[in-house]
Amino acid sequence: MGIIDKIKAIEEEMARTQKNKATEHHLGLLKGKLARYRQQLLADEAGSGGGGGSGFEVAKSGDARVVLIGYPSVGKSSLLGKITTTKSEIAHYAFTTLTSVPGVLKYQGAEIQIVDLPGIIYGASQGKGRGRQVVATARTADLVLMVLDATKSEHQRASLEKELENVGIRLNKEKPNIYYKKKETGGVKVTFTSPPKTNLTEQAIKMILRDYRIHNAEVLVRDDQCTIDDFIDVINEQHRNYVKCLYVYNKIDAVSLEEVDKLAREPNTVVMSCEMDLGLQDVVEEIWYQLNLSRVYTKKRGVRPVFDDPLVVRNNSTIGDLCHGIHRDFKDKFKYALVWGSSAKHSPQKCGLNHRIDDEDVVSLFAK
């Protein structure tokens, strides 16, 4: 029996099994097996070297990467053409984009790479179409922009979320608060900081570890709301990606005002119409907000700060991160920094490598 057949058999057994107290451990074991087989399927495909095709991979560049994911002909290519400095082939039929097309969104002094991926197809997690290559690129994103057709949004969103979930991409989720360490000896030790309120029991943890052939490990569950699914994610951590997702509903000109209002009120959501140029600026502003970037202006001694060419860093970055962004060896030569702005207690403040900088701070760096 091949891996795809095994996956199908487990999914069918899970569908047949009633969810209750008596079956929750059995279902948890099936979920663990399913996660293992899906990962094996993706690893086999990646190792086979097939399917990528010319131009599929795009080198990561700029201050952040955003990937556009959606079904064919939902308006991804149109959106890319409207907000970036590139052109993606556009047509009114499915599968126009056959390779990943990059563009650059210049906003607030930052250069944000936007990648229009081939239209993802239902069944990517079982090896259908080019979905596997699409999700492999999505794993490298700082933000997923899920573009949906407002006239078909409910079905599209649910199926895309399921596909991404199946291949280990977790949208708008935090890593489970579980400490897990594989050991050489000592057996399995499980500790809960408070009694679990879910199906994640000590027995379930030990059953799943046994199925993964892990006989020595330390597990500390710090959150009483963690589930079996969360624990499976923890032991498969190297194959899990926790990515922010912004849901963009296109073609709002084709639905009622009531429906537009309902969609717009959902969290992490923007509504727009590419054809009518409605809501495009809202999309750009929300991308900037979700990426949570900070601009830092540099200043040389005796010279005014450079305000038209900021260094862009992740929010909550330190002076050390800033130095590394300039050059990886710069930290070794670093002496001190002078900081003006909201992160400084007084202006200027003399700071070391661990000082956290805020958006629009001005920084002077001094070397030894």
Swiss-Prot record:
Binding annotation for GTP: 70-77, 116-120, 250-253
CC annotations in GO: cytoplasm
The entry's keywords: Cytoplasm, GTP-binding, Nucleotide-binding, Phosphoprotein
OBG-type G domain residues: 64-292
Gene Ontology BP annotations: cytoplasmic translation; positive regulation of cellular response to amino acid starvation
Positions of the TGS domain: 292-367
One MF term in the entry's GO annotations: GTPase activity
Subcellular locations according to the entry: Cytoplasm
Family per similarity comment: Belongs to the TRAFAC class OBG-HflX-like GTPase superfamily. OBG GTPase family.
Function: Involved in ribosomal function.
Miscellaneous note of the record: Present with 6200 molecules/cell in log phase SD medium.
Protein name in the entry: Ribosome-interacting GTPase 2
Organism per entry: Saccharomyces cerevisiae (strain ATCC 204508 / S288c)
